[in-house]
Amino acid sequence: MNKKIFALPLLAISLSFTSCLDETPKDQIPESEIYDSANSLYVNAVASLYNYIGAHEEGEGLQGTCRGIYDYNTLTTDEAIIPIRGGNWYDGGLWKNMYDHTWTATDTDLYNVWKYLYKVIVLSTKSLETIDQHKSLLNDQQRDEYKAEVRAVRAMFYYYAMDMFGRIPVLESSAQKTADIRQSNRSDVFKYIVNELQAVAPLLPNEHSNL
């Protein structure tokens, strides 16, 4: 009995020391610090989307021979061809299949392109939701310009997805359940893209980089 009573204080002490080990992870930044001003909201919710345009991972990127958008829009035509040099550059028949149009739905690289396009579309939709959640940081002009810029980026990625895959879903929110997602007719997606770009064009800022 005494042993059990003695064990209780030890258990309480051990639990108190364990609570001292609770630390705020240094590799994570609270959302309140990420979105604490108009500038930080732009950097993290708008400008960050441009990082995905020039991505270099396989299956990602709009430019460069990264087995992504550029390759599937160029090496599938007479515009360019990658010849096999002996056993080199065969890569499991990847480039030949592109040129011959003999890819399948199970091809990893083509699947990565689909994932890449919709990753940016979902992130763009999430950015629009984030801007609305923190609209108190912005004046009306900033809010309109931020959202217009994101909508323009998203429309561009919808265009590439429609151009490559035809009937694609148009997402209503970043948290939309997979079971609720439906394909849209290609003509409807095209109209959606045009309407988005026409709506945001007057709201986009005139400033641009020199790159």
What is the predicted role of each segment?
Residues 39, 43, 51-56, 86-165, ...:
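Conserved, well-structured interaction surfaces
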Residues 2-3, 69-73, 133:
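First exposed extracellular module after export/assembly in secreted or surface-exposed proteins
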Residues 30-31, 102, 172-178:
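Short linear capping/connector segments at secondary-structure termini
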Residues 1-30:
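Bacterial Sec-dependent N-terminal signal peptides
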Residues 19-74:
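Membrane-proximal, proline-rich intrinsically disordered regions
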